[in-house]
Amino acid sequence: MGKHRDLRSSYPSSLRDHNNLYQVSRFEEVEDPTIEDFINDNATISFGIVYFKNIRLKNPNFGFPYISTDRMLAGALSDIDYISDNGRVLKCSGEFTLVITDVDLELIMRIYDADKIDINLCLTAEAAPLPKWEADFIDEYFKNKSDYKNILKDLEKAFAPDDDVFDANNDLTKVKNMFNAIYGLHAQDPCKGLLIRDEDTDEIEEEEIDISEEIDKYYGFHKNRFQKSSRGFLPYSVGVWCTAYSRRKIFSEIFIVCPPSGSNSAGRGLYVDTDSLFYLDNEATEELFEIDNKRCYDEAIKNGDYITDNKGNIINYNSFDEEDEFMRFKFLHSKCYAYEQKTPEGAKLKVTAAGIAARKLKGMKDGKPDYIYKEEEVKTLERFNDHFTFKECGSTKSGYIKEELKTVNIDGHMVECGNACIITPTQKTIKDFGLKQKVYQFEKMKTGRN
């Protein structure tokens, strides 16, 4: 049987759970850095430029490669003969560099072998837990999310009127958005120029900026000491390491199902996303997941990293929750998969495809909205393939009209109008992002010749 598990509130969990997260000193360069300088257990965070030569998976059967093909090619130092799948490197002959964090290098070294790894540049800063005011703020919205989920479940169980369920679902969505926006505030570009509109041509351009000056303004560095400014009260570095720690957490769950250097890697893991994993379960795997969840729960109780919801339940961060079971699973590429969910009534098709609407309004039936859902359009798992076209739930396209603000007469009505965006439905076809084997010719790409 297949199972699907999700990390509970992945990014907020990483914000609340990790001590080495909040940058409290300026990044300093390490002289003659080693891998040990780059990856350490002290209260520091590190990033820099790392050199790699001739990499390959430790186990060819491991189904979750880590290194991005695009980032590898962007840092190419020679011709590179590589094999990639779904935008991730399986094997590469050649030399390249990556700009990565300490967490990334730790994961890469667990998954890949390389002929050579060197640290070209290592920048390190002291780090500390989030300030209490932000931790409390995250807890507040975590509780709100948990409470609204309970309210929605109670309404659904009681077969409440559709309007009540709809309103409760909207409330939950708003709370989730605010909860996740806390991480988003740490992920704003610290060096973004103002957008300037030319009143004559109506063209919009971004102002040119001096990056080093903008970084100094953002972090408020004065007289060689770290002094946060009002503009930099939520450091960008927190967003960087939050996502890095979240990647490490999901890979720790992947390694339970598929050890990167063991013989059990083949066939057990099916698909991984930012915070979810689809896999083939067995008794030993489920026991390991529950042991890990128990460890996270005990640590949360000890450290106070939990909330109590409106039903008196203790809800902790970092749990890897079981979502559903499935009988068949089909993966095409990132954010594009389908499976037959196991239910008491039998198999139920579930489809996930980026950019595809969950449903489309066909009209009214018996006084109620009549929708067609994306699963109805796909019909069966066998029909879900590369080049399948969603004709009903496809997507939308936008057309923009530039016009001076004016008042016009439309059928006797005086209507004020101006710039407009016309949104119309459109079809969407699934693309093929399969296995690729290519030779990247460094000299041709460097000079712009093909």
Predicted regions and their residues:
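Conserved acidic
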Residues: M1-N450
